[in-house]
Amino acid sequence: MNPVHILAKKGEVAERVLVVGDPGRARLLSTLLQNPKLTNENRGFLVYTGKYNGETVSIATHGIGGPSIAIVLEELAMLGANVFIRYGTTGALVPYINLGEYIIVTGASYNQGGLFYQYLRDNACVASTPDFELTNKLVTSFSKRNLKYYVGNVFSSDAFYAEDEEFVKKWSSRGNIAVEMECATLFTLSKVKGWKSATVLVVSDNLAKGGIWITKEELEKSVMDGAKAVLDTLTS
């Protein structure tokens, strides 16, 4: 089957891909590549391919939420990709994590049903965890660059505006330190499809502190600093 949304050709997408939700972020991070080439812009799913540390990598846009990232991952895999690092933003659920810091994700909680039921074809739950080797490399890369990070589980939500005080208490009490929208899909599909995947998140807001948000300038700096560590990992 050929991709329907990502209209790149085989050979125009690398085996190793940094995936982000925001097309603007994909455009920004492409400046870190040598000779980046825009290989897809259909549907706003920007994909760039270039060199970093002498290795070919791609930066691709996955949009918002589980169904969107599932489509993009499936189509990138059709084009030859099999290693994915999601690099996104997250809302902290615990007060000790500061804005602009990083979370290297070790697992994702999620609600049953929907996309997961359709892929798994029953109500069984797959452990939604990243590739250990890739995650360990991320820890090493972030440590080498002296970037402040936490390692822990997140909750993958399907409803951005359903996050209130009760939500924070519920999911933090279950061992989750942050909330985002795509990790569970990424990790579960990777298990089912035989891909390798991992995730790093930049803390853009803290729900445990009343929903305070990072400034645009501070977020961009943290994103660019962390992206170098992510690309170091992809090319090591």
From Swiss-Prot:
Residues annotated to bind phosphate: G21, R25, R43, R86, Y87, G88, T89
Keyword Transferase: yes
Biological process annotations from GO: nucleoside catabolic process
Its EC number(s): 2.4.2.1, 2.4.2.28
Gene3D superfamilies xrefs: Nucleoside phosphorylase domain (3.40.50.1580)
Keyword annotations: Disulfide bond, Glycosyltransferase, Transferase
A Pfam family recorded for this sequence: PNP_UDP_1
Pathway: Purine metabolism; purine nucleoside salvage
Catalyzed reaction equations: S-methyl-5'-thioadenosine + phosphate = 5-(methylsulfanyl)-alpha-D-ribose 1-phosphate + adenine; a purine D-ribonucleoside + phosphate = a purine nucleobase + alpha-D-ribose 1-phosphate; a purine 2'-deoxy-D-ribonucleoside + phosphate = a purine nucleobase + 2-deoxy-alpha-D-ribose 1-phosphate
PROSITE patterns referenced in this protein's UniProt entry, alphabetically: PNP_UDP_1
InterPro entries to which the protein is assigned, alphabetical: Nucleoside_phosphorylase_CS, Nucleoside_phosphorylase_d, Nucleoside_phosphorylase_sf
GO molecular function terms noted in the UniProt entry: S-methyl-5-thioadenosine phosphorylase activity
Entry GO CC: cytosol
Ligand binding (a purine D-ribonucleoside): H5, E163, E180, M181, E182, S204, D205
Temperature dependency: Optimum temperature is 120 degrees Celsius. Highly thermostable.
Similarity remark: Belongs to the PNP/UDP phosphorylase family.
Its job: Cleavage of guanosine or inosine to respective bases and sugar-1-phosphate molecules. Cleaves inosine, guanosine, and adenosine with a better efficiency than MTA.
Subunit structure: Homohexamer; disulfide-linked. Trimer of homodimers, with three symmetric intersubunit disulfide bonds linking the dimers to one another.
UniProt protein name: Purine nucleoside phosphorylase
